[in-house]
């Protein structure tokens, strides 16, 4: 229920499996801006990520076949060192999903995409571009 009511999380089936997008907004930032150089998830970011923990654990089992997980971090245009920032975001999300029962061996990619893939090319600096994606790959990569 919590996941369905969260307007900042979008889940969709894709050819590879299930893609979960987590978006920041002005009033709901996924990351704690007051943490200085030590990047941290905000309380909202932790709640959003924890709301999919059960789903991640379910795909972890996948009828004994398991599945792989890819994490991609994104930043809006105008962030200092967007590649480094987005890589740090992905690593932070990785650390948190391990706490939810995901096995380290399941996470096959941790990607920092910087500001190279804005949601809306017309608004590359929009807060929604400060986001991360989790791909639960249920089909092997070709």
Residue ranges of model-derived segments:
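Periplasmic peptidoglycan-binding/tethering modules of Gram-negative envelope proteins
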Residues: 1-63, 139-142
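Short coil/turn motifs at beta-sheet boundaries
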Residues: 13, 64, 125-129
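Periplasmic OmpA-like peptidoglycan-binding domain that tethers envelope proteins to the cell wall
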Residues: 21, 36-44, 48, 70, ...
